[in-house]
């Protein structure tokens, strides 16, 4: 309508990877984005619970930051998690549509098996005019390879990365096709994985790293 005042330009949503846990593995860009934005969002597994992402970035969080604790229960069922993704996206969108930049802090890398992927999908679908930027982070398996001096790939090696919770049958198929297999979320199927590795004679070549 002519003469009607336009609303503020939307803020930018940043997905900020913080790395695997060591604050010294945060990138300079991650630190700069955190310093620049007024709103920070951190994932928690329940209201008031400790946030691992917040702990990594604690030295960069200021008293004047608006801090959003977004609840994502430790569940795997998408139907259970979807309302939490929607609420998180809505809480962020309220700030973004008011013109405030916001950073979603993620352990590891934002686009590698992270909660940010779901929030990103929701916001870009519902608010396609909101700018989004992603700051990559060091993934846990890269840090694990470095800590154990285990090269992941060389020359023509084939590498697969997948959650072990896909099932031992899937893992066995992947082991047949790839030179290096990185398994995430192994604890729920640890016994079955150990049996598989023993059966295939791969136990001497396996490395387990825990946080």
Across the structure, where does each feature detected by a protein language model lie?
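Structural motif
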Residues: 43-45, 165, 184-188
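Small/polar loops that bind or transfer phosphate-bearing groups
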Residues: 17-18, 104, 136, 162-163, ...
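A contiguous loop/helix-start segment that scaffolds small-molecule binding in enzyme catalytic cores
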Residues: 10-13, 97, 174-211
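Class I S-adenosyl-L-methionine
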Residues: 1-23, 28-131
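Class I SAM-dependent methyltransferase SAM-binding "motif I" and its flanking Rossmann-like core
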Residues: 3, 107-177
């Amino acid at each position: 309508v002519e003469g009607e005042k336009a609303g503020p330009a939307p803020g930018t949503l940043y997905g900020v990877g913080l790395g695997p846990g060591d604050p010294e593995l945060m990138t300079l860009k991650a630190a700069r984005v955190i310093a620049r934005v007024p709103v920070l969002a951190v994932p928690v597994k329940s209201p008031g619970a400790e946030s691992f992402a917040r702990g990594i970035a604690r030295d960069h969080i200021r008293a004047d930051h608006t801090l959003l604790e977004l609840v994502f229960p430790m569940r795997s069922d998408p139907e259970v998690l979807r309302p939490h993704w929607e609420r998180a996206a809505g809480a962020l969108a309220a700030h973004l549509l008011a013109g405030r930049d916001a950073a979603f802090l993620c352990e590891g890398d934002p686009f590698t098996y992270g909660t940010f992927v779901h929030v990103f999908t929701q916001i870009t679908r519902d608010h396609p005019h909101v700018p989004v930027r992603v700051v990559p982070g060091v993934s846990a398996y890269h840090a694990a390879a470095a800590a154990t001096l285990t090269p992941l790939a060389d020359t023509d090696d084939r590498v697969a990365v997948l959650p072990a919770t896909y099932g031992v049958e899937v893992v066995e198929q992947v082991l047949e096709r790839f030179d290096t297999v990185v398994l995430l979320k192994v604890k729920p199927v640890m016994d079955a994985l150990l049996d598989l590795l023993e059966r295939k004679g791969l136990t001497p070549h396996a490395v387990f790293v825990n946080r």
